[in-house]
């Protein structure tokens, strides 16, 4: 039965660390022993390179997470293939009452960046297809659907880009929204201005916020006058 506090349980954390030129300089990988969902779903079994016997040898999530964050270091930014990884990670963190991540959490959605740069229609594709399109070698001992291997290939996709390509393409995970005015985010991108506001108790409170209801045009810097129904 699904637990509403943690619908998806993380069973593996894998990552690669990149330098400023997107060279892989370190890796992290650890299997997690599940607490809630100890039996793998059939469709999950078909794509993983291990089974329940491997999971039983894993370590608790909170132990692995603390080790992983320590490995990340002080100055880092996440890059993920898709937008859901950080959301699921934070759901698991909440279940174990771990200290929340910074709010809002800045990261690079490499899947979306790839789509914007390499697909005329901006179509989202799976990691394997992107790797094939970029003619990145798939190593025999690094099959897909392993957290650390998928991170490895995501890193190689980034390697085909330059830091300048990513300068304006960051986004924010808003699993935890800003709670106060001082924590709000106003970020200037090349083609738009992003404003992540604090939470409001009701619609009337939001409407009464002049800065929220009259956003700034990213081109001219003037405030707009939107209509609210």
Label the predicted regions.
Residues 1-90:
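Conserved non-catalytic scaffold segment of RNase H-like nuclease domains
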Residues 157-229:
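Acidic two-metal-ion nuclease catalytic site recognized across multiple nuclease folds
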Residues 101-114:
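Conserved beta-strand -> loop -> alpha-helix junction used to position metal-binding or nucleic-acid-contacting
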Residues 91-97:
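A short secondary-structure junction motif
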Residues 67-70, 87, 91, 129, ...:
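Residue-level signal for well-ordered alpha-helical scaffold segments within enzymatic catalytic domains
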Residues 92, 147, 151-161, 165:
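AAA+ P-loop ATPase catalytic core
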Residues 45, 52-55, 113-151:
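Active-site-proximal helix-loop-helix substrate-binding element of RNase H-like nuclease domains
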